[in-house]
Curated annotation (Swiss-Prot):
Expressing tissues: Expressed in epithelial cells of the cement gland.
Localization, UniProt: Cell junction, Adherens junction; Cytoplasm, Cytoskeleton; Apical cell membrane
Subunit structure: Interacts with F-actin. Interacts with ROCK1.
Protein known as: Protein Shroom3
Protein species of origin: Xenopus laevis
Biased segments, Basic and acidic residues type: 245-259, 357-366, 476-488, 793-808, 1529-1538
InterPro entries: ASD1_dom (IPR014800), ASD2_dom (IPR014799), Shroom_fam (IPR027685)
Gene: shroom3
Gene3D superfamilies according to UniProt: 6.10.250.3120
One GO cellular component term: apical plasma membrane
Domain ASD2: start-end pairs: 1467-1756
The record's note on its domains: The ASD1 domain mediates F-actin binding. The ASD2 domain mediates the interaction with ROCK1 and is required for apical constriction induction.
Any Pfam family the entry gives: ASD1
Length: 1788
């Protein structure tokens, strides 16, 4: 802002004000005396100081935009060299050591003056031509003014009259600076560019306004060097100083001390330090500088008695300067009025008239040129004691004369004395000490006086003079000042200095006793200095110098008051420190908006009498009179009202907060009641004078600031500095704060807001300064930031780098800013966590001990991610996987990091005032979040919203608020899937607690998403987007992967997990079942989902249906939750499905749901469903309940479901057709339910996971388990989405933090999972099973539960004796097809449970036990043997699982009933035979672990890790179930374990390879059998087993026939679908469809063939004995390797097919209606499922045949002949007993 001619600046600039010295080169200055170095002021009064303490500045002069703007922008110590640096330093901020509000206001106005006056060693100005850049707060621009070194000389405290320095009062700093630069006529040259030393001095002066102790100032004012040189000038200066005090007072808030702003006349204060070369103003005083080159007002390091004194080293010191200060001093007093002060600023800055009026006018004219608006950091006025001020006041004319003389003397070196005497004026000194730095009170006073004089000139210099003389009486001064304050206030509103005039007036009016602690005034000076900073102080200094005559009178008064105040301050310097903080508290009590404070200050400036103010300050009440001094940033008005100070006790507190913020900016001498009190007490006139100077300076500064504002506005615009943040401080900041620098705490936010580009350290500086002000006011702490440079910790620096956007907040001391912010801004809680430190604390509160500050950006992200994970873990009880967290983190980082509300709120992290404002705005929005889940801004917006879903949902824009950079709302939309899933699932977890609220919210978002995804609206793109994993479609390929993809919302995700295989889907399903089971268990309605979707749900056993339905519901619910389909309302639990339904083709949804239910009954699922079954009173009740519940969402209707016949038409064609026959009621219920939920989620969900399950042949078992019906139906159903959705969910679950557990919670409590697809129409086998059930009454629910558990296990292998054989055959086929034996068992049993599930396809007499399906692992022989025994028991256990009565009863019970003696006997026979005839062990051993085609097929579909996990879990669960179901038969349990993946174990493969060897072994064993009886018994057992196996084979054959019928029906359905598609779709799309269907057959057959071959090879290898030759083993291994490679290729083909299925489903969804789409899905899924089932049945039949052959061969020929007769009877009995179990096909 201020450019310093390098040639002229020379070393003094760099030495004294080197940018580094500003911050660090304070060593050159006694830190005690460095009240505020221009650097500090540059940071405070300068752009930076304005940025930091914009409140201190006029709002026009944003603190960040003052001299320190460069510092903020550049963050360089050499910023002083830049325009900003010169501005800040030249802003009349002498570099003087600022003690943190210490008692010694080393740079109090007095001390400054005394230093200057005493030494002229004070600030020595090198012949440097300084271009003073003054930032006009009001104008918001910085203007560059060349400060004449002569002015600086004038401002030299020893050489120059204080008035010159004072003419550059803090208030006039800006305008004075302009005037100084403008008033080139003034002897002052442009002050040297302030170095960071200046800022440091300023900062420290801000921090240590006490250095400007009133005593020091009084002493300085009273005993300026000018006193010796020219007592008149001294008195004049004293008088001027008071006026300058006013002008400076105004400047003091902006106390940017430079020779211009600092008093031209050194006070008598002796500066310990001589200005270093580079430091225009040495701490010891103003050092002479060539007139053309103003020097920075370096506050000499005076004794602590020179506390508040600022020395304008750079202030143009010339005779005119001195004269000006003389004039300005009088005007400064009149300029106590804001207008006058402003005028004085503009005028006095510009004018250092030889005559008071002339000088005033000259100052007005010179202001910018003549005066560098630098307030002396130390006032020359300390020497000019109150008496001198009084004398000055009394001698306004003499003062003017003195000023003239002083100007001459300044030329002669005596001007400094005058000026200093003016500054020596206690009031002026107090003003400076009030002005935080109280740059030479002479400077500030003179500046203020000049400003006042300028104001008086503008408003009547003579009036000021007269009034100043009149102002000898503080009342007159107060009156005039009040008037002028009104003007000054107006100006202050425009100007950055509002309070100073009042302060100056205050002290003038209230000459406080010198004993009164200077700390209030010092604090004020400190605040003011902060606020005034460089530009203001320089401006005020010149202004004061200009308006010396009127200021003289005022200075006299001010001197008296100031002298008294100075004494009181001197005595109370420490008190002032504490008092300063007190005053800050009092003044800042109402510190709300800088504007308000400024306005209040203006009013106070206008209204309060200096005496009143002084009384307050003299009383040094904590209610500092500066209640008025609340500085509004725009106006940065220092309210000097006494009444305001009193009434602002609360305001003072807020004002303190604000003051600290403003102190940084303003050096709030006036706002700080403590400073004021201190000044007014010790130097009563000092504050008044300072205020007068501030007023004068304000007047001058107004013009100057206008120019500066123009420049600064440009700078601000360039820096994107926002001044609105200056106005941000809410009025509620009234709560009394410790002298927390108002500017800092509010400016934390404000600063950040003020200057987005301002470094954090700037903002931090302000907070730091606030802290410093507080601390300094307490006299204890030094600012974390010295000068413009902020002391930032390594952590803060790290954070600044980690969050470069918040570099402006880098320096912010989290402790300072946060505490200050919190304490001050508690009303605005937004600052509680504005800073990164706050966020870090948040994370720590989240259990993140590590500090974000210390973290690198990646570490911070990790920390946030961890916090998110912790939060999720807390909320959901499950810690999300790293991937999930990663997704969340990525999602959240985009939102959270860029724009999290917390970040926005974080002051340190806030990049700009806008950020802060947004924080504030968003804070209100964020508050709910903070309250609800302030967990961590690291949490992704969605999660954050989840933390407070209601808040988030209620505030859809909240995420945006939360993260302005990336609104979560948009991100939520873009990441709708992830967020929704997280949200939904999280909501689910929460939903248990508040289901509807979260659900609705989630559902709204989710449903929208899901409906869009779920329905046709959910395009393939959605699926692709949502489901980047096409493999999820593996299941689709099984039955209707397209449907799965159709319900891509759920299924695609889930299918991704399930894509590889149905088994994977089953596994996922199991996994999901686990979670879902709990969910569904929590709400039995899950079963309804099954019914809802259940095309054929009712007839099945209610428990079975319930199981499957619940499992399906769980899956569906997961799916729904994922897609947001789940209804927020428990009643509408399935409604979420309904919601997507409209998006999804209704038929698809219905069909999918209908099939989905059966698809997902795995062991775990079954167990969970069993648990849910337990919940239900009875299977029937459960079914009814679930039906009802599922029916609840009838709104989601599906044409298919609505038209049961129509649907049954397809289903019957699909073998579920029996669904109609199954039960009209069940169909109707199912239809209704499907209408409600089925259409919604069913088709897609069912299809999706169904296709997954069905498609994965291995998982077809699981599906079979899930599908408690015919394999065909189950295949389609199992292939339906329920499984894939679940799988997807589980896959999603990995992504979603809250999904599974929450799903469980939410489902258990709140959500009813979408109704699973209705069970397929009952088959004949179902009818048989039903009959059997009728024969065997239903057992209690407990049995049902056990039965369900057993069913899961039996799903694997267990089937009742004959039923079991049938089921096993059908299961085998079913599992092969899709659901496998699981589907057979669970499906058949379910249908039985639900009622006679009439499966058209399961026409095979149920009585025929399907030994192979149930006990595929068992050799068929054994199974045949077991038909009555083990097989029967297995069948019974599985059927028991399926049949509520039979299997639902505890297996033992069921076995006793359902398991016919034949079943148990067959098992026993098999065991006995194996034990006696080892040759049959491999074939008959129920525990045989031979691999089957279904096993390998299952592997094909369990590619996804989640599916594998589910599979493993399912196996474990099945094992457990098996243990529960058939604990009695270890072989059976082992068999179940073996059959975990596929109950359809084709021992045929194992038998074929080792067949000959086994036979040989059998023969050998037989030959070795000892005892004919034993042999006879074995033979009998074998015969019995053969009979049983024969029956089973018959059942299997019947099942195969039924399966063939199902295949035909499905093919007919496919033809219909194809016809529809051909008519609806484009040719190329139809071709794709045709190719897909054709390839589906090929791929499925290929997989089956390869799986079968591979299974046989593996079995052969496993059967190889140790004696097997290596060559043989090698041959088998090579075959295995070859087959494995081929099988892998086939899997790839399957994956490709799944992707193609996705595409087909996507475009078909656009053409087909819901019903048609459901038919398509059913067709596709059933196609693959039926193929698998057919292959499975073939394998089982082969196995049974081999078992029979082996058994027959093992029997003696004679025995065989005798046995043939009995076989038919056994067969009949077994059939009669086993007719109940539906054929294996029926399970399909």
């Amino acid at each position: 802002m201020m450019q310093v001619s390098q040639g002229t600046i020379g070393s003094p600039w760099h030495q004294a004000y080197h940018s580094s010295s500003s911050t660090s080169d304070l060593s050159g200055y006694n830190h005690e005396f460095l009240r505020r170095s221009p650097d500090q002021y540059s940071s405070r009064g300068s752009m930076e100081s304005l940025d930091q303490a914009s409140a201190a500045y006029h709002h026009h002069l944003p603190p960040a935009k003052s001299t320190n703007c460069i510092d903020q922008l550049v963050h360089l110590h050499n910023k002083r060299d830049s325009a900003y640096s010169s501005f800040s330093t030249n802003a009349s901020i002498p570099e003087y050591r600022s003690s943190p509000f210490s008692k010694e206001r080393s740079y109090s106005m007095e001390s400054m003056h005394s230093r200057n006056s005493s030494g002229q060693e004070g600030i020595k100005h090198a012949d440097i031509k300084y271009i003073k850049t003054v930032y006009d707060v009001q104008r918001g621009i910085s203007e560059e003014y060349e400060v004449n070194s002569s002015s600086v000389k004038n401002r030299n405290y020893s050489r120059q009259p204080a008035y010159n320095r004072h003419s550059i009062g803090p208030h006039g700093r800006l305008e004075q600076s302009r005037f100084f630069s403008e008033s080139g006529g003034f002897e002052r040259a442009a002050p040297m560019p302030p170095t960071r030393s200046d800022s440091y001095a300023l900062t420290r002066h801000h921090e240590r306004p006490n250095s400007w102790s009133s005593l020091d100032q009084n002493r300085n004012f009273r005993t300026p060097k000018a006193a010796g040189l020219h007592s008149t000038n001294t008195s004049s200066n004293a008088a001027q100083q008071p006026k300058h005090v006013h002008g400076d007072g105004h400047l003091h808030p902006v106390l940017e001390r430079s020779p211009e702003s600092s008093p031209l006349i050194k006070p008598k204060q002796v500066y310990s330090e001589t200005p270093q070369p580079g430091q225009p103003m040495l701490p010891t005083g103003i050092y002479p500088v060539p007139a053309p080159e103003p020097h920075f007002a370096h506050a000499p390091q005076p004794p602590k008695n020179n506390n508040g004194r600022l020395y304008p080293a750079l202030a143009k010191e010339g005779s005119y300067g001195a004269k000006s200060s003389e004039k300005v001093l009088p005007f400064s007093e009149p300029n106590k009025n804001e207008k006058d002060t402003q005028n004085l600023r503009s005028k006095s800055v510009g004018q250092y008239p030889m005559n008071h009026s002339v000088k005033e006018r000259e100052k007005k004219q010179e202001g910018p040129t003549g005066f560098a608006h630098y307030k002396l950091h130390f006032t020359a006025g300390p020497d000019i004691s109150t008496s001198s001020l009084t004398n000055d006041r009394n001698d306004q004319q003499p003062l003017r004369l003195d000023n003239i003389d002083i100007n001459e003397q300044q030329k002669n070196g005596t001007k400094v004395a005058e000026e200093f005497s003016v500054y020596a004026h206690p009031a002026f000194q107090n003003e400076w000490s009030d002005s935080k730095t109280k740059q030479d009170i002479a400077s500030s006073d003179i500046i203020g006086l000049h400003r006042n004089s300028l104001s008086s000139d503008a408003h009547g210099e003579h009036e000021y003079h007269n009034h100043f003389n009149i102002a000898s009486s503080s009342h007159n001064k107060m009156d005039e000042r009040s008037n002028r304050q009104a003007d000054h206030r107006k100006k202050l509103e425009s100007l950055s200095f509002t309070v100073h005039a009042d302060e100056a007036d205050g002290p003038s009016s209230n000459p406080l006793k010198p004993d009164e602690s200077p700390s209030p005034s010092q604090k004020k000076s400190y605040d003011f200095t902060r606020r005034r900073l460089s530009s203001s102080s320089s401006q005020s200094s010149k202004t004061d110098g200009n308006k010396l005559s009127s200021v003289f009178d005022k200075v006299c008064k001010i001197e008296q008051r100031e002298h008294e105040n100075h004494r009181s301050q001197f005595l109370c310097g420490n008190i002032n420190q504490s008092g300063l903080s007190t005053r800050g508290q009092n003044n800042k009590g109402s510190f709300t908006m800088v504007e308000e404070i400024r306005n209040k200050f203006i009013s106070q400036d206008q209204t309060p009498n200096p005496n009143e103010w002084r009384r307050l300050s003299s009383s040094h009440s904590n209610e500092k009179v500066t209640g008025m001094h609340q500085l509004t940033r725009q106006g940065i008005v220092y309210g000097l009202q006494t009444g305001d100070a009193q009434k602002q006790m609360p305001e003072k507190q807020a004002e303190k907060m604000h003051s600290y913020n403003q102190e940084q900016n303003i050096l709030q001498a006036v706002p700080d009641d403590d400073n004021r009190s201190f000044n007014s007490q010790t130097m009563p006139n000092k504050e008044d004078d300072w205020q007068c100077a501030a007023q004068d300076t304000l007047g001058f500064n107004r013009a100057y600031r206008n120019s500066v504002k123009d420049a600064q506005c440009k700078v601000l615009e360039a820096t994107s500095y926002r001044r609105k943040d200056l106005e941000i401080s809410p009025p509620h900041y009234k709560k009394p704060e410790k002298n927390v620098r108002p500017a800092s705490a509010p400016f934390r936010k404000k600063s950040s807001s003020l200057s987005p580009h301002a470094p954090k350290e700037r903002h931090s500086v302000t907070p730091t300064d606030n802290c410093a002000s507080i601390q300094e006011s307490q006299g204890v702490f030094f600012p974390s930031r010295i000068g413009a440079k902020r002391r930032i910790t390594a952590e803060q620096k790290k954070r600044s780098y980690s969050e470069p956007e918040k570099m402006n907040e880098v320096g912010a001391s989290e402790s300072e800013s946060a505490p200050l912010t919190v304490s001050k801004m508690e009303p605005v809680a937004s600052f509680s966590e504005n800073s990164v430190a706050d966020r870090r604390r948040i994370f720590e509160r989240e259990g993140k001990a590590c500090s974000t500050i210390n973290l690198s950006k990646p570490q911070l992200k990790q920390l946030q991610q961890n916090a998110l994970a912790d939060y999720i873990e807390r909320k959901t009880g499950r810690r999300p996987s790293s991937q999930e967290t990663r997704l969340l983190k990525e999602r959240s980082q985009s939102t959270y990091f860029s724009g999290s509300i917390m970040d926005n709120q974080s002051m340190t992290s806030t990049s700009s005032m806008n950020s802060l404002n947004e924080h504030n705005l968003s804070y209100r929005h964020r508050e709910p979040l903070s309250k609800t889940g302030r967990v961590s801004s690291t949490l992704p917006p969605g999660l954050t919203g989840f933390f407070d879903l209601s808040s988030f949902e209620n505030n859809p824009e909240y995420p945006e608020n939360r993260s302005r950079s990336s609104s979560f709302a948009h991100q939520l939309r873009s990441e709708r899937l992830l967020d929704h899933r997280s949200k939904v699932e999280f909501g689910k977890g929460r939903e248990t607690n508040k289901p509807k609220e979260v659900s609705l919210q989630s559902d709204d978002d989710v449903i929208i998403t899901s409906s869009r995804r779920h329905g046709k609206s959910a395009s393939a793109e959605d699926l692709l987007d949502r489901l980047p994993q096409p493999p999820a479609l593996h299941v689709r390929s099984r039955s209707s992967p397209a449907s799965d993809m159709k319900s891509r919302e759920y299924m695609s995700r889930q299918e991704v997990g399930n894509k590889t295989s149905y088994a994977s889907a089953s596994n996922k399903e199991i996994r999901s079942i686990k979670s879902n089971h709990f969910e569904q268990m929590s709400f039995t309605p899950s079963f309804k989902n099954h019914i809802d979707t259940g095309e054929d749900p009712v007839p099945e056993n209610s428990s079975t249906i319930q199981r499957s339905a619940q499992l399906e519901n769980q899956r569906n619910t997961k799916t729904q939750s994922i897609s947001g389909i789940y209804s927020p309302h428990p009643e509408t639990k399935q409604e979420p499905l309904a919601l997507p339904i409209h998006s999804v083709p209704a038929k698809v949804t219905q069909t999918s749901l209908a099939h989905a239910t059966f698809d997902y009954i795995t062991a775990e699922e079954y167990l969970y469903s069993g648990k849910r079954g337990k919940e239900s009173a009875s299977p029937t009740d459960n079914k009814e309940i679930s039906d009802q519940e599922w029916c609840l969402p009838e709104n989601s209707s599906s044409e298919d479901l609505n038209d049961p016949e129509r649907f049954a038409k397809y289903t019957s064609a699909q073998r579920p057709q029996s669904f109609e026959t199954k039960s009209g009621n069940s169909i109707n219920e199912t239809v209704q339910q499907n209408k409600s939920s089925g259409p919604t989620a069913g088709p897609k969900f069912s299809t999706s996971w169904k296709s997954n399950g069905m498609w994965s042949s291995g998982s077809s078992e699981a599906e079979t388990t899930f599908n408690h019906g015919k394999i065909s139906l189950h295949i389609s159903e199992s292939c339906l989405q329920p499984q894939s959705p679940m799988t997807g969910q589980e896959d999603e679950g990995d992504d979603e933090v809250f999904v599974k557990e929450q799903d469980t919670e939410s489902f258990s409590g709140t959500f009813v999972p979408p109704s699973p697809p209705p069970f397929p129409p009952p088959s004949l086998e179902d009818a048989l099973l039903k009959q059997r059930i009728e024969k065997f009454p239903l057992v209690p629910n407990t049995l049902d539960e056990i039965w369900e558990n057993t069913e899961e296990a039996s799903t694997q292998v267990k089937v009742k004796s004959n039923e079991r054989y049938l089921q096993c055959a059908s299961e085998y086929t079913a599992s092969t097809e899709s659901s496998g034996s699981y589907l057979l068992n669970s499906g058949i049993t379910k249908r039985d449970t639900d009622g006679p599930l009439l499966r058209l396809s399961s026409i095979v007499p149920a009585p025929e036990p399907l030994a192979s399906p149930v006990d595929p692992t068992k050799p068929i022989e054994e199974q045949e043997t077991q038909p009555h025994g083990a097989d029967t028991s297995i069948l019974q256990s599985s059927e028991g699982n399926f049949n509520p009565s039979d299997s639902q009863s505890t297996l033992p019970h069921v076995r006793s009933e359902l398991m016919s003696s034949e079943d148990a006997k067959s098992q026993e026979l098999a065991k006995e035979i194996v034990t006696k005839d080892k040759s049959l062990a491999n074939i008959l051993d129920p525990d045989s672990r031979m691999k089957t085609t279904m096993d390998l097929m299952e592997g094909l579909f369990t590619k996804s890790s989640s599916a594998l996990k589910e599979k493993n879990q399912k196996r474990k669960a099945k094992k457990q179930i098996d243990n529960i179901i058939a604990p009695e038969s270890e072989x059976k349990e082992e068999k179940r374990e073996t059959l975990d993946n596929a109950s359809n174990y084709s021992a045929y493969y194992s038998t074929s390879a080792p067949k000959a060897e086994l036979l040989r072994k059998m023969k050998t064993i037989h030959s070795q059998i000892g005892g004919k009886e034993e042999q006879f018994d074995v033979n009998e057992k074998k015969a019995e087993l053969i009979s049983s196996l024969t029956c089973k084979l018959e059942v299997l054959k019947d099942a195969k026939e039924s399966l063939i019928d199902d295949i035909k029906l499905n093919n007919s359905l496919g033809e219909e679908v194809e016809t529809q598609i051909e008519t609806l779709c484009k040719p190329n799309e139809f071709d794709k469809y045709k190719m897909f269907i054709g390839d589906l057959d090929k791929v499925v057959n290929l997989l089956l063939s390869l799986s079968g071959r591979l299974a046989r090879v593996e079995n052969a290898l496993s059967s190889l004995g140790e004696d097997a030759s290596a060559e043989e083993r090698k041959t088998w291994n090579e075959k295995k390797k070859q087959l494995c490679g081929q099988h892998e290729d086939a899997r790839e083909l399957k994956e490709n097919l799944d992707r193609r299925e996705k595409l087909v489903m996507d475009f078909l969804g656009n053409y087909l209606t819901g019903e048609e789409f459901a038919h398509y899905q059913h067709f596709v899924k059933m196609k693959s499922a039926l193929l698998i089932e057919q292959r499975e049945l073939d394998d089982k039949i082969k196995l049974g045949q081999e078992q029979l052959r082996c058994l027959t061969e093992s029997l003696p020929s004679d025995y065989l002949i005798s046995m043939k007769v009995s076989l038919p009877e056994e067969r009949r009995s077994s059939l009669g007993n086993k007719s109940l179990p539906p054929p294996l096909t029926s399970s399909l």
